[in-house]
Design a protein with these regions (language model features):
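Hydrophobic/aromatic-rich structural module bridging two neighboring secondary-structure elements via a short loop
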Residues: 1-25
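Ferredoxin-type iron-sulfur electron-transfer modules in oxidoreductases and energy-metabolism complexes
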Residues: 21-27, 31-175
Length: 175
């Protein structure tokens, strides 16, 4: 079974078993040399909006903002994504929906992310679409994910993306 080497334990093999080590094979990850692949397209998604920008000084202390337990648990689950790219490599379409949705979900579920939620959701999804294939719901990504990120985050991201497109289009018309 194909898996990330960080999730592979030698105790799972018997003496004489053959082990094949090769780089992730995905259109979004061109091989640079030997076992190294260029994973910079994942960085482009984060650069497109995978952060919260807040002017310091006037902002309230983040620890004083109440977060409902369910939202905190879901955000924590999404934040568990380590950005390894196993989801992209496992997908027959080389899609990065699970990675992107984990980043969108992590920020979008917290009160601190609400101010910029629609702009970075749109930017991150569009950056993802520039570098990776489209999701056709095979679910291989979630199966390969070492952090067991749920496919539910893809639905969350798709919903937020549609809301963002509608909202941002409405705002663009209000000049």
């Amino acid at each position: 079974k194909a898996t990330a080497t960080c999730q592979l334990h030698m105790r799972e093999f018997r003496d004489g078993d053959e082990i094949v080590i090769e780089p992730f094979r995905a259109a979004g990850f061109p091989v640079v040399r030997d076992l190294a692949v260029d994973r910079s397209p994942l960085d482009r998604i984060i650069e497109a909006g995978g952060f919260i920008s807040v002017n310091t000084g006037a902002a309230a202390e983040a620890n004083l903002t109440p977060v409902p337990k369910e939202a905190a648990d879901q955000a924590f689950d999404a934040a568990a994504c380590i950005g390894c790219g196993a989801c992209v490599a496992a997908c027959p379409n080389s899609a990065a929906q699970l990675f992107t949705s984990a980043k969108v979900g992590h920020l979008g579920l917290l009160p601190q992310g609400q101010a910029e939620r629609w702009s970075w959701t749109e930017s991150m999804v569009e950056a993802m679409e520039e570098f990776f294939g489209s999701c056709t719901n095979h679910g291989e990504c979630s199966e390969a994910c070492p952090k067991e990120i749920s496919l539910d985050f893809i639905a969350f991201m798709n919903r937020d993306y549609m809301k963002a497109k509608i909202r941002n289009r409405s705002l663009a018309g209000q000049h």
